[in-house]
Amino acid sequence: MKVKNSLRSLKNRHRDCRVVRRKGRVYVINKTQRRFKARQG
């Protein structure tokens, strides 16, 4: 999982990327290509 300051570029890496909030943190998840996971921080 990548940790980035801004998720704007990461959510555009694949068409299935979704931005979700969990426990106060912002994540990018991808159900089909799991290597595109990222967390903001």
UniProtKB/Swiss-Prot annotation:
InterPro entries: Ribosomal_bL36, Ribosomal_bL36_sp, Ribosomal_L36_bact
Assigned protein family: Belongs to the bacterial ribosomal protein bL36 family.
Listed name of the protein: Large ribosomal subunit protein bL36
Domain of life: Bacteria
The UniProt record lists the keyword Ribosomal protein: yes
Statement: the UniProt record of this protein carries the keyword Secreted: no
A biological process from GO: translation
Coiled-coil intervals: none
GO cellular component entries: ribonucleoprotein complex; ribosome
Keywords of this entry: Ribonucleoprotein, Ribosomal protein
Pfam families from the UniProt entry: Ribosomal_L36
Stored SUPFAM superfamilies: Ribosomal protein L36
